[in-house]
Amino acid sequence: MRRPFHTPPPVYDPARGLLHSDHFQIGYVTNDLDRAVDIFRTQFRIEKFRANDAEMPGGTKISTRTVWIGSTMYEIACGSGPGMEAFSKYAPPDGEFVLKLHHFGYLVPDEEAWQAMEREVARGGWQMYMSNDTPGYVKACFVEVPEIGHLVEFILPREMLIERFNATPVA
């Protein structure tokens, strides 16, 4: 179906404001990944997900399930252990079942735009979480934005993450 209205092209200018980047992802957080995936399968008829699971030293774990629905990537994330507070703060591993909106994901096209985003975060007085820069994979961070009630994630994808995104199933 073609949209019956004009959709502007993505904006890539975080220097204009924190949300002036290409919004491509909706992220959910959970403390029970199997149960959350089952909800997406039974309630929303999403059959296939790309699974990514990582365990690190010290008991840190992160698991995600991703799928493209139209031009939006949906992500369900479950993180626990040291360094995963950006997830466990919103879905405590030992708490009651949680599945809720966690973040909007924004693509950052290049290092210049990344630096503009960092300046905007500093200007706004927001807190940055889990900032990482993995050569060949991704430069990413979460920013806590209490004014809108959820985190925003900024992603500057590199070759390996681009391959992973391209291999993500389409619902």
Q: Model-predicted segments: where are they?
A:
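Amphipathic alpha-helical segments
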Residues: D32-K48, A116-G124
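Vicinal oxygen chelate
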Residues: M1-G17, H23-N31, R65-G70, E75, K89-A113, A116-A171
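N-terminal beta-strand motif that seeds the catalytic metal site of vicinal oxygen chelate
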Residues: R2-V37, L99-Y106, N166-A171
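Short, structured motif recognition centered on aromatic/hydrophobic residues
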Residues: H23-G27, F40, Y74-A77, L101-F104, ...
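Histidine- and/or cysteine-centered catalytic micro-motif in compact active-site loops
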Residues: G79-G81, P109
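A cross-kingdom feature marking solvent-exposed beta-strand/loop segments within repeated
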Residues: P10-D13, I46-I62, G83-H102, G124-Y129, ...
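N-terminal strand-loop-strand beta-hairpin
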Residues: R3-H6, Y12, D22-G27, Q43-I69, ...
